[in-house]
A protein has these predicted regions:
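Short coil/turn motifs at secondary-structure junctions
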Residues: 12-14, 51, 64-68
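An amphipathic, aromatic/His-enriched active-site/gating alpha helix that lines ligand/cofactor pockets
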Residues: 26-43, 60-100
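Short, low-order "capping/linker" segments at domain edges
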Residues: 99-112
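Periplasmic-binding protein-like
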Residues: 54-56, 105
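Short, surface-exposed ligand-recognition loops at beta-strand->loop->(often short) alpha-helix junctions
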Residues: 11-26
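Active-site-flanking beta-strand signature of metal-NTP-handling nucleotidyl enzymes
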Residues: 2-11
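A short beta-turn/loop motif at secondary-structure boundaries
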Residues: 47-54, 88-89
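Amphipathic, soluble alpha/beta structural segments
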Residues: 56-60, 110-112
Length: 112
């Protein structure tokens, strides 16, 4: 069933302006395009709230099903990039959410 993964995060306070700029270049030019390639990933988008591109950031993946996420972590092209991605995040304030689309198939499965 269609699922969405949302990683909400702030960047580490210790990052310099240059490091923040480098992170954004990496995120948009390398990480997001690599996440979009595997089968089952329908879209990858990045949203920013009121945090001046340092806080209240969301990485949103729309996938065919939630199991796609586990495969992404093992994907040969993605796993070397995870250290750079997670290394810039303030993991103490980071959250992740999985939501699923309510479809007739889901209702059928839940009512069985």
């Amino acid at each position: 069933m269609p699922s969405t993964y949302v990683r909400r995060f702030n960047l580490k306070d210790s990052l310099s302006d240059k490091q923040v700029g480098d992170f954004w270049k990496f995120l948009l030019a390398e990480f997001v395009p690599t996440l979009q390639k595997p089968a089952g990933v329908n879209s990858v988008k990045v949203y920013s709230g009121a945090g001046a591109l340092r806080a209240d950031i969301r990485l949103v993946l729309d996938m065919d099903h939630a199991g796609i996420y586990e495969g992404l972590l093992r994907e040969r092209a993605i796993s070397p990039l995870l250290g750079t991605f997670y290394g810039a995040l303030d993991l103490a304030t980071s959250t992740q959410t999985f939501i699923r689309e309510v479809t007739p198939d889901l209702l059928k499965a839940l009512s069985s």
